[in-house]
Amino acid sequence: MEIIRITRILDGRCRGSSRPVIVETPTGKHLIKLRGAAQGSGALVSEIIVAELAEALHLPVLPRRLAILDSDTPTEDKNDELADLLAASAGLNLAFPLLDNARDATKKDFFRLTLGEKAAILWLDRLVLNPDRTNQNPNILYSEEQLYLIDHGASLRFQYNWSNITEETPSYVGSMFKPHIFEMVSEYPDWVHWESLFAQCLTRSVLERALAAVPSSFIYPLLPDTILDNSLETLENNIQRRKAAYVAFLWKRLKFPRNFALEPPIYQEMNTSKIQHKRLTNQ
């Protein structure tokens, strides 16, 4: 993945929990997802992996670059919260090009997607446990007659709970808070045929390439503290083992029968005090 250097922070206004910023680079303006944001580097790992898998399914996503943020990168925004965020994000971050005239897509724009493309989007989001593509927030961008899938940082939730993963965990259906914007596509007669074709596109080598695109510095903060004190060589070996664990999890999830595709998702109950989690089991 190409590496660019951030030369100036142009806009640091808060834009959701991921708190991306708009920056200037030698190749133009970019939107940067920061490693120091609330979701941490795990969100950047998810963004890269899901985008790589989307491209393997011929779905439109934005090109990605790695962006170096120096501790002395100039900014005219003197907000203390932003300053803390930038300080916590020194080093490599994830960059997306800032598109001209981009806006959030609406239902009126979705005619540009074929039924098969809608099915592929639904299938991919179920595979990677992406809860963020709903009627309220489609996370689809429109620019210059083109749609792009965006914001996959909340996917791959299993990466925060490796110690509780069992042999059966990858076969769990998965849970969502709200229905997917294209949920009804799974009721079409062709769904079973489509989902089989999608699975054939995601070979083990595709999964391995997706993980190879993830920088070690994004995996490092996700390792247990007991591992971090090892030598650099041992640490790199542990990072590669963790990448292999992502591949193994997704590969097992892709094995037939794919419950995530053939069974409806489990919906979690939300209230203002806490989230009541239903167990992710096959029902």
Would you name each region that the model predicts?
Residues 1-283:
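Phosphate/dinucleotide-binding and metal-coordinating scaffold of catalytic cores
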